[in-house]
Design a protein with these regions (language model features):
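Extended catalytic cores of very large enzyme megasubunits
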Residues: 1-638
Length: 638
């Protein structure tokens, strides 16, 4: 029987700090094995109740063991919320969503989806925002008082009421007295309440924007800013867990320059979204060069490229998706092709250095089964019926591969990569079709992708998605709140620790020595063009959606990379470009070290750590809830 514990101290820390739920009856946090038991306990009951389907014991054992041994991973949203939270609201099991801002309801629906921990892609393209109504010419104070109930539904309904009144020129008062104080534990969903102040800030922000838009429709940048402000208020225990991508027209100058100059001084909410231009056809060279130069000048990879024509062609390629009448969008990491008002769940294959074609095929089969189980979550509260309709029709999966650079078969150094990827994709499709038929649901319309895999790769100790390892040896730093019992326990257990230089009074920084597998590829081993060629192989031969990647571009490579992107534009989407940096700073998440420094730190790590003693430090729920930033390249620390 596999161990109930994870193999390394770092992996144990990631589980306890990110995914472990508080067990009030036992007065402690879950073990790794108990987290997995909770996940399967939920799905066994859910599938039986909703579909009359019982998971065979032999299959359940195989799936449980594969997760215990970190061979595959389910949706980390499901892993976090399985139980009462997921039963109460199925949205909380999803990683990704997309919505066009073409209806007034889009704003409160986005708030509700984000509050469930799901990442949101949204579009403020003019063909959508032009459908919004005209704002009133004049504004008058109203006697109406919006009383906000202390729940996700309460917050969403209150925002809906406020926006509705602002459109007709009435400025109501609001009563936030029922909202729990900041820091109050959230029993069902986990984590801690953010208090009334963020919602008050959002309401005032909306009033100001609407007053400036009197007598006309909201502009794209105004809609963008409202959505960003909505995301900014969705915080739990100081952990931002909102992820956004904003799509705008290529010709939209205001959105192109949304992050130009000292934008953070006056428009801090814009930090919450990654921005991409939406291409509906291949641009001419002049337009492309202008946008490429703006991306280069930004030093932050913005605006990124979302190619809707490419996404539509990709969606149609497998013959299982009805693309007619759909203007596709994407999720914050840009690996899933989504209809307006649609969710996607993710699951993951973890590639190990010793994996063979046979073991990879088995992992793909099991990861597709998990995704198929998760695709039965179609009971959504509050949001419009289109969300449930789209999910029930398409049953999208996002079966991803992480650790690609750790194995010569998957990183292209050995064997025929294209042939292997085709075989793996066919196995995923077949696995889904078989299990979907047994459950009694439609086959999924699209199945395979590559996600950035930030927190998951940390949990399982693998290279992130299709990204290279940092270095053969490196030090990984992670932060802990000094009030958190886990931090206090680790300090006393003797983990290497120092005060956070930016916040010494409240935050500790722990260091973990890390060693990459011997056949791994490192970030200095590949040129930007080589990274793109590997990405293209996965796009053509593995993905029914898209592979998400962040390409590190050296200063002398920008012209060549721009040329490659233009030449391969029909495939482009899901790629971010950032300047390659050797620059490191104090307490950076990844720090290069040599073998001697690695061995020295390894010898200083505490031995035989008994994580169960954490229970003696914590007498009530101090978990901070869903720290996984639903899905965002910025949150993945790649």
């Amino acid at each position: 029987m596999p161990s109930n514990h994870l193999p390394t101290l770092y992996q144990e820390f990631i589980h306890l700090s990110r995914y472990s739920r508080w067990l009030p009856e036992k007065g402690r946090r879950e073990t790794w094995g108990e987290t997995i038991e909770r996940y399967f306990g939920f799905f066994s009951e859910h599938l039986k109740e909703m579909h009359g389907y019982e998971i065979k014991k032999s299959l359940k054992d195989k799936l449980e063991n594969a997760i215990l041994e970190c061979k595959i991973m389910p949706s980390m949203r499901c892993l976090m919320t399985a139980g009462e939270a997921l039963k109460r609201e199925n949205i909380s099991g999803y990683n990704c969503s997309y919505v066009a801002v073409d209806r007034v309801q889009a704003f409160d629906e986005i708030l509700y989806v984000l509050m469930n921990g799901t990442g949101v892609g949204f579009s403020v393209e003019r063909q959508f925002v032009s459908k919004l109504p005209v704002v009133a010419e004049e504004f008058f104070p109203s006697d109406t008082v919006i009383t906000v109930a202390d729940s996700k539904l309460g917050w969403a309904k209150a925002l809906k009421e406020l926006v509705g009144m602002l459109y007709i020129g009435q400025v109501p008062k609001w009563d936030l007295g029922k909202i729990r104080p900041a820091g109050t534990p959230l029993k069902t969903f986990g984590g801690r309440a953010s208090g009334p102040e963020p919602l008050n800030g959002l309401f005032n922000f909306c009033v100001n924007i609407f007053k400036k838009a009197n007598g006309r429709k909201l502009s794209s940048i105004e809609c963008h800013d409202i959505v960003c402000k909505i995301a900014e208020i969705v915080v739990v225990g100081g952990v931002r867990r909102s992820a956004l991508i904003s799509l705008s027209n290529l010709s939209d100058d205001r959105m192109r320059h949304a992050k130009s100059g000292q934008w953070w001084e006056h428009e801090g909410q814009r930090a919450l979204a990654n921005n991409s231009a939406c291409y509906t056809e291949k641009p001419d060279m002049g337009v492309f060069m202008d946008e490429w130069k703006a991306l280069y000048d930004s030093k932050s990879g913005e605006r990124g490229i979302f190619n809707r024509a490419s996404a539509t062609e990709q969606a149609a390629r497998n013959g299982r998706r009805n693309t007619e009448g759909h203007e596709y969008g994407t999720n914050p990491c840009s690996e899933i092709i989504l209809r307006d008002r649609e969710f996607c769940n993710l699951s993951e294959v973890v590639v190990r250095p010793e994996d063979t074609k046979e073991t990879l095929l088995e992992k793909v089969e099991l990861a597709a089964i998990l995704g198929t189980f998760q695709s039965t979550l179609v009971n959504f509260k509050y949001v419009s019926k289109e969300w449930s309709k789209n999910c029930a029709e398409e049953r999208l999966l996002g079966v991803s591969i992480t650790g690609i650079m750790d194995n010569p078969l998957t990183n292209g150094k050995k064997g025929n990569l294209d042939s292997l990827l085709k075989e793996l994709k066919e196995r995923a499709i077949k696995s889904n079709a078989t299990i979907a038929k047994e459950i009694g649901i439609p086959q999924s319309a699209a199945i395979t992708c590559v996600k950035p895999s930030g927190t998951v790769s940390q949990l399982v100790d693998a290279a992130s998605g299709i990204h290279a390892r940092h270095n053969p040896y490196y030090i990984r730093t992670v932060r802990g709140d000094k009030k958190d019992p886990l931090t206090q326990m680790m300090v006393e257990a003797g983990f290497p620790v120092e005060d956070d230089i930016m916040n010494p009074g409240h935050t500790s920084v722990f260091s973990f020595p890390m060693k990459a597998p011997s056949h791994a590829v490192f970030r200095t081993d590949m040129s930007a063009i080589e990274q793109l060629e590997l990405w293209l192989s996965y796009q053509k031969h593995w993905c029914e959606h898209k592979p998400s990647v962040t390409i590190s571009v050296k200063e002398e490579e920008w012209m060549e990379v721009g040329s490659w992107v233009f030449d391969n534009f029909e495939w482009m989407s899901g790629v971010s470009f950032l300047p390659f940096s050797d620059h490191t700073y104090q307490q950076a998440p990844y720090q290069d070290c040599d073998v001697e420094a690695y061995k020295k730190m390894l010898s200083s790590m505490p031995k035989n750590v008994d994580w169960s003693v954490l229970a003696s430090y914590e007498t009530r729920d101090m978990t901070v809830g869903s720290q996984e930033l639903a899905c965002t390249a910025g949150g993945c620390e790649i």
